[in-house]
Structure formats: structure tokens, C-alpha cells
A protein has these predicted regions:
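Short, structured segments at the rim of ligand-binding sites
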Residues: 1-410
Length: 410
């Protein structure tokens, strides 16, 4: 059991975007020649380590020095690929449709929590194309054509198809059978492919045309991560000014929306010189649709605890299929602290401004839940957590960042 206390304030540097890094690493593995990916953390988070191990298993060569990763595109094509995705949903979903185009048969290993997350839309689609597709194995190639798939379960399905279809000899179309949620992650995949010579374009609201392009080596730099920064920015609104440096103000990351959410809630948001500073204001509850930004739910919850009135987080049903059921976990653990929170099928409502108290809480083996609870410590006089080390999934340096902002760990 680890105790956390303190009211975070000060300055911290954004960690590199995990979402962008996954995509760059896979594009580099699929490209001809030697690519360079700059701006990575000195210690890779668990999820990126999973992707690195998997692209090596696919036949790419990779050398990691300091903050730079050099990747030489896939040469050998093993008959059987064994890909250990650990607990990384991005690794699994991005590589699943790619793997059968690389080797004869791909076998996937994964954590129990990842195994519980849905994959049927992709396996059923590939089966319809003649591929032997099961949740933990896939074999058999497929050709270009039309690929209908739901857009409201996981945007990673669409991103994986974009990567795979770029390798085919002819044009393909991804047709969304339901409205796309988390579109910004699909756009991030399209931008990553473009950096390596790939080409795709929207045809109306529900179809993406993917053109056959031989990916070429590139030299790219990973930008700062708005998802990870969101909790620090929310802490600035709650406790005292927090500055996050290294964030691109023109980023296409969807979680950049945290800035406008905090502004709507009444916090002061200042941008300039590659940094963002958030300072407290008279926070008020608002309604937030997280259909495109579900990973912001923990940061919104933190700000909502200190806001007057009700904050409603809605259209986040996919939060129930993350590393844990995040809606249930947020409601359960914040109630332990005395929060006035109601759980809904697709979100939650927090009536803020009430007095909280310390407690022993569970992290549910979910890095986002652990970080949320740690950042609430200043509102409740301290908190004790079991399993807080799960933050290494996305941010192995998180404890250091927390201490840098004045937090105490014992």
C-alpha cells in the first residue's frame, strides 16, 4: 500500500504521445529502409515496449538509444509469428489485420484484461474475406476491396485496417456502418501513414479510400501527449497553476479538447511558446460528451470534484471496455472518498464542491484510474493505493512527475 498526498502545482514536461509512437513504430516496420523516430522517453512505457517487441517478432530490426529509435523495415517473413501484446490494446488491434499480410500465421499472447476486450468486428470482417481469424490467431492473406466495419466500438479497428490496406496492391475502401467515434485517432493514423508515404482520403462521411503505396523510411519526431497531460492540466484548475511544456498548440490529438473543457468550467487557460498553463477559477459543472475523447473522463472527474454544481460525462460507453470498466471504477473509488457521484450506462454525474476524506482505494490494474486517484489526494488529505505501479503501462516516470509538482509518496 502506497500513500500519496499533496496539492500539485508548478511545471512539468509533457511525455511523448503514446498513440503517435505506436503508429510511427508500426509504419517504420512496414516501410522500406531505415527510419528514425525521435523524442521518445528514455524508459519506454509498457505498451510501447509491447509494440517494439512485436515489430521485432514481425522481422523488423530496431535499435533504441536515449530518446531515439532506429527501425529497419521487415525483411524476414517467418512462417509463424508469435506476438506478445501484453496489456496493450493498441498493439493488438493495430497489428492484428497487418500480421497475416506479413507471415503465414500469427499467434497473439495478451493479458487477461486485454483478452476480455471485444475484437469480434475485426475477426468477423476478416473471416468474410477468407482469412482464418480467431481472437488469438490469424492466418491467410486477403486482397483489396470494401471493408465494412462499425465505427462506434473502437477506432483502433479502423486504424489497424488503414495500416493493413496500405500494403495491398489495389485500392480499398473502409466503410463505416455506424458513426465513427474517436475520429482524431483515425486521423492520427492517416497522418502517420502520410509521413511514410501512405495515402488515404475521406469519401463523404462514412468511407475512407486507401490507396496502395509502398511505405518509405522517414525521420519523425513524437509530439507531446495531451492525454497524459490532461490530468496535470485539471490539477492546475483545482489546486494551483500548472504549466505543461512540450505540447503542440496545433496538434490533431483529440484530447487537446481538455483545454476547452477546462475553459468552459471556468479555469484560466493560457497558451504560448509551446506550453500550456492552467490556473484555478470559479469552477462550475458542465455537460461533456466524451464520444470522441473517452480517455479524458478521469481528468474531467478530477475537475468536477472541485466544481460547483453537476458535471455530466456522457456518451462514453466504450469506457467500460478499457483496461477495466472505467465508469464503474471511477464511481466506486470516488465514492470511497466521499464524492457525490452517480453511475450511468455511458458515463457518470458528479455533484462537486463537497468535502472529501482519505481512504484506501483500488487501482483496478488501470493506469488511468491510478493516476486519477493519485491526483485527488490533495482534495481528501491523502490517499492510500494498492497497485499504483500500474502507471508504468503508459508513464513509468509518473511518480517523478508527481513529486516534481510537490506531491509526496510514502
Amino acid at each position: 500500500m502506497t500513500r500519496f498526498s499533496g496539492r500539485p502545482h508548478g511545471s512539468v514536461t509533457a511525455i511523448p504521445s503514446k498513440s503517435a509512437a505506436h503508429r510511427y513504430m508500426i509504419c517504420a516496420a512496414l516501410a522500406q529502409g531505415r527510419s528514425v523516430i525521435r523524442g521518445l522517453p528514455g524508459e519506454l512505457p509498457d505498451d510501447l515496449t509491447a509494440t517494439l517487441d512485436c515489430i521485432r517478432a514481425l522481422g523488423a530490426a530496431a535499435v533504441f538509444r536515449d530518446d531515439t529509435l532506429e527501425i529497419t523495415g521487415i525483411n524476414a517473413r517467418p512462417d509463424v509469428l508469435r506476438l506478445d501484446c501484453r496489456d496493450s490494446g493498441a498493439t493488438y488491434r493495430l497489428l492484428y489485420p497487418v500480421a497475416p499480410l506479413i507471415g503465414g500465421r500469427a499467434e497473439f499472447m495478451q493479458s487477461p484484461s486485454l483478452a476480455a476486450r471485444p475484437m469480434e468486428p475485426v475477426t468477423e470482417l476478416l473471416k468474410s474475406k477468407g482469412v482464418a481469424a480467431e481472437k488469438l490467431s490469424v492466418s491467410g492473406s486477403f486482397g483489396p476491396g470494401e471493408f465494412p466495419i462499425r465505427g462506434d466500438v473502437s477506432s483502433q479497428y479502423i486504424s489497424g485496417l488503414l495500416l493493413a490496406l496500405s500494403l495491398l496492391e489495389g485500392e480499398s475502401r473502409i466503410r463505416l456502418t455506424t458513426p465513427l467515434q474517436s475520429k482524431s485517432y483515425v486521423e492520427l493514423t492517416r497522418a502517420s501513414l502520410s509521413a511514410f508515404g501512405g495515402e488515404s482520403q475521406w469519401m463523404g462521411q462514412d468511407t475512407i479510400l486507401v490507396k496502395p503505396r509502398r511505405l518509405k523510411a522517414a525521420d519523425v519526431t513524437v509530439e507531446g501527449d495531451y492525454t497524459h497531460a490532461s490530468l496535470f492540466l485539471a490539477a492546475g484548475a483545482v489546486y494551483g497553476p500548472v504549466t505543461v511544456t512540450g505540447l503542440d498548440p496545433g496538434s490533431i490529438q483529440g484530447d487537446r479538447a481538455m483545454l476547452s473543457i477546462l475553459d468552459r468550467m471556468g479555469a484560466r487557460v493560457d497558451m504560448g511558446g509551446g506550453s500550456v498553463t492552467v490556473s484555478p477559477g470559479r469552477l462550475r459543472g458542465i455537460d461533456v460528451d466524451v464520444s470522441d475523447t473517452p480517455d479524458l473522463a478521469p481528468a474531467i472527474a478530477l475537475a468536477a470534484l472541485a466544481a460547483e454544481g453537476s458535471t455530466v460525462v456522457k456518451n462514453g460507453g466504450r469506457l467500460r471496455f478499457k483496461e477495466c470498466d472505467r465508469i464503474s471504477a471511477i464511481a466506486t473509488e470516488l465514492k470511497r472518498l466521499g464524492a457525490d457521484i452517480d453511475e450511468a450506462p455511458d458515463g457518470f454525474t458528479i455533484r462537486g464542491g463537497g468535502k472529501l476524506h482519505g481512504a484506501a482505494c483500488r487501482c483496478h490494474n488501470d493506469h488511468r484510474i491510478a493516476m486519477l486517484l493519485i491526483m485527488t489526494a490533495g482534495l481528501c488529505g491523502g490517499i492510500e493505493l494498492n497497485g499504483a505501479e500500474c502507471v508504468s503501462k503508459s508513464a513509468p516516470g509518473f511518480f517523478g512527475e508527481y513529486r516534481q509538482l510537490g506531491g509526496s509518496i510514502s
